[in-house]
């Protein structure tokens, strides 16, 4: 085995950073999604920085302490005041064998019933209470998705179908999508996204990541920018505004449903071209150059083939959005083979109470 997992069975001497769990149901033997709920919020972020630093040092031979400004895992607005709770605008549940809504036990298929979900935003919690999600009896195995976006009314899907007022909503115009709004300075970007499609779950994440990406790309007025793994177009619209009338944005996404959302969200943006297909295949078919490349790959990272295709376009800089420190470090090492060095990095605590973090890295040559 490359690694071992262990569970604490007894605490002989508690760390000063150990606190009463903010979510006892996510403790030992409990549900997943809150594995750090017994750790003080500041200590969670310091530990995540240590993990990020260790992966970059081990896989990319980069010392995080050499970067300026100094890298810390940043909390998002409102999180400290809420104690790292009530941030999720999307919550997925499943009914257990007795018909109660709950979540899977950590690294298990067993469903444990819940009475509440403390990471859920206030709007999600209100929706759950209004629809009696945790007190209603469901058919065992029922999938329950609660979505309360920043920008429109909440939506409840039951086994993928709209649910309203205690029953399935069979109206032809029943809502299956939501509207998200991201405010950047004096400009507001509006996105229509499938209710069960991908969108950042933290209420402040879309704005925080987009600001970091725009800071990372710098002045791109008149430039050609590639937006790879572009999803529903979170970065595409702000990048289109940044390149201006003389620039272009090529957005590439492999997921068909995300591309449908992206086409709606990019409607009217004349300088945006959308391509549907695996990123490596689209890049192989399109040999045009790029001034700047933005990548936001899934957890597995971009990988060597995509990195080589990106480097072959000789952009002046690459802005890499990562949700896995090891994948980021590996791809930073691949980019280094083509002369790109890590010049700045920001890390965000988008998932308090869990081991996950998000990073935005800028590489230049």
Label each region the model flagged.
Residues 62, 338, 363-364:
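Short alpha-helix boundary/capping motifs
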Residues 275-357:
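S-adenosylmethionine
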Residues 34, 324, 361:
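Residue-level signal for inorganic ion chemistry
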Residues 191, 342-343, 365:
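A polyampholytic, Gly/Pro-enriched intrinsically disordered region
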Residues 356-365:
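Core SAM-dependent methyltransferase catalytic element
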Residues 1-295, 300-308, 314:
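Accessory RNA-recognition modules of RNA-modification enzymes
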